[in-house]
C-alpha cells in the first residue's frame, strides 16, 4: 500500500509541474479547469476551447515542450445542450457530407459525427471542425458511415457511449500508471515465449524490463481445444503467474484479429486476471470482437462450454485503446509503442517497441505479407531504430515458395470454370477476415468482365467482416482506395455477392441443382458453416473444394488437404459417420496472407536499420530452425529459434 501511495504522490507532482508549464503557455482566456492523464494522452479541460484553437500551433508547441500527446476538451459546464448542438452541426456541415448519425458523450465532452463523406465534416485544414468546436463547445470526433451496416461497429460504439464514465475513470488510471516515475533506470530487457514459439497457434510473447511488463498477443489454438495444455498460452510459466497475481502487466498489444493472436483476451477478464489497457488498431478491435463472439457461439453450438461470455468480450471493448499506423504512444514509464502496417489482414500491425531512452528497439512482425495484394499494401520495413526483430516463420521452410499471385488467380478461375462446367459447386473455406475478402476481390473483377456468371454465396461471419472492411477504406490498398474514392465504385458492394442469412438458406444452396461458388468460414474447417457444406458436398465428384490459406496440424482442413478420402465426423445426433471425400481437392497457396520463404528472406534484406538479432517464431519447428539458419548464413545476423517457455535476454 505504501508503494502505491508513493507512486500516486509522484504522479501528482508530475501533474503539478505540467500544470505550471501549461498555465504559462496557454492564454488565460482559455480558462483551464482541469489537467489529467487519460490513457497515453494528457487531457486539458477548458471553458473556452476556441482560445486555444485559434492558435493552430499551440497544441504542437505544448506537445514538444511536455513530450506528451495533448488533447483539449471542453469543460462539461460550457457544453451546449445536445438538441441545440445537433441543430447547429447540421447548419455548419455541408449537406453533401451526408451526416447519418450524431451521438453525444457528456463524460468526455465529445460528439460523434457519422457521415458518408467525413472529409467534408472536417473541412479544409480542419476549418469546419474548428467552427463546430467554437459554436457548440463539444469536441467533434468524425467517423465514416459504413456503406454496409455493421452490427459489430454499432454495438461497439454503443458500449463505449453507455460506459463512458467508467471508461474515463479507467483511462485516468491507465494514464497515471504510464506516467508514474520509474522506480529503476532501464538496464535489462527479456522476452519469454508463452505460445507460438516453434508452433502455429496461441501466440503470446512477454516483454520484460526492470520497470515494465508488456504482453504482445494472447491467442488460442482452436484446433487443440480438447487439450488445454496445447490450446492455451502457458499460464504455468512462473514469471507470467507472478505478473498476473501481482497485477503488474502494464499493457497487452494485439497485432491482428485472428483468434490465434487474440482469442484468449476475454478469458483474462472472465477470471479477473487483467484490468489494464489493450492497444491495437481500430479495425483490429472491431474484427477481434466479431471473431471472439463467433468463437464462443460455435463452441456453444457444438455442445461445448464456451471459454468466456459475451460480457467478457464487452470488457475487452471497454479496455481497448486504438492507435492508427504511425502514432507513437507511451504505454509504460520506459516503453513507447508504434504500430506499422503488416499487410496480413485489415488493421494488422507490426509492433515497434522503443525501450528506455534509446536503450533497445524491438519489432515484432506478427503475421505479415511483404508483397502488395488486391486488399492491402505490403508490410512496413523501415523503422527509426531497430536492434531485435521477432518474425514469423509460417512459410519459413526452404521449399515454401508460393505461386505468383497472378498465377494463383488464373488457377482459381480455372478450377471454378471446370467445376461449373460439370454442374458442380465450389466450396472455398476461408477465414472470415482476410482470405475471404481477398478472394472476393478476385471473383468480383472476373465477374465484372463476364468471366463468372453463377451466384457467389458468403456464409458465416464473412459478410459482417466485409462490412467492417468497408468502414476502414483508409487501411486498404492504394488501388482499392482509388476505386472507392476516385472512381466511385466499391467492389465489396457488388451485386454478385449474396450473404447467407440462416441454416435454411444454406440447405437450399446445398440442395439446389444449380452450380454455385460458396465462400464460408472457417478456413481450416474447424467449426462454422464451411464444415456443414463440406459434409454434404464432399461425396459428389462434381464438386470441388479449394484451400486458399494455411491449414494447421490437427485440423479437418489439413486432413482433407493431405488426401485422406474417408473421414469420420460426428453427425447432428451425435453419431459418428464416415464422410467419403469424392470431390476434387485443390490447394492454391498464392492467396496466403503470410509471407513465403522468398518474402521472408527479402524482408530481412530490406528491413532498415538492419537488426543485430533476429528471432524466428510462429512456424512449425523445422521451419523456424530452417529460416533462422538461412538468415544467419546469408546475412551474418545472429538468429535464434526458441521454444515455448524459453527466455532470451536482449540487453
From Swiss-Prot:
Region Archaeal CPSF-KH domain: start-end pairs: 1-200
Region listing for Beta-Casp, in residue ranges: 399-592
Entry keywords, A to Z: DNA-binding, Endonuclease, Exonuclease, Hydrolase, Metal-binding, Nuclease, RNA-binding, Transcription, Transcription regulation, Transcription termination, Zinc
Keyword set includes Transcription regulation: yes
A single GO molecular function term of this UniProt record: RNA endonuclease activity
Cofactor names: Zn(2+)
Region (Metallo-beta-lactamase N-terminus): 188-398
The protein's role, per its UniProt record: Terminates transcription on the whole genome. Termination is linked to FttA-mediated RNA cleavage and does not require NTP hydrolysis. Cleaves endonucleolytically at the RNA exit channel of RNA polymerase (RNAP); the 5'-3' exonuclease activity of this protein degrades the nascent RNA released from RNAP. Has nuclease activity on single-stranded RNA.
Family statement drawn from the similarity comment of this UniProt entry: Belongs to the metallo-beta-lactamase superfamily. RNA-metabolizing metallo-beta-lactamase-like family. FttA subfamily.
Protein name per Swiss-Prot or TrEMBL: Transcription termination factor FttA
Upper lineage: Archaea, Methanobacteriati, Methanobacteriota, Thermococci, Thermococcales
Naturally occurring in which organism (per UniProt): Pyrococcus horikoshii (strain ATCC 700860 / DSM 12428 / JCM 9974 / NBRC 100139 / OT-3)
Region of interest (KHb), ranges: 80-147
Region of interest: KHa: 12-79
Subunit-level organization: Homodimer. Interacts with RNA polymerase (RNAP), interacts with the Spt4-Spt5 complex.
NCBIfam families: arCOG00543 (TIGR03675)
Metallo-beta-lactamase C-terminus: annotated segments: 593-651
Coiled coil location: none
Pfam family, one: Lactamase_B_6
Gene from which the chain derives: fttA
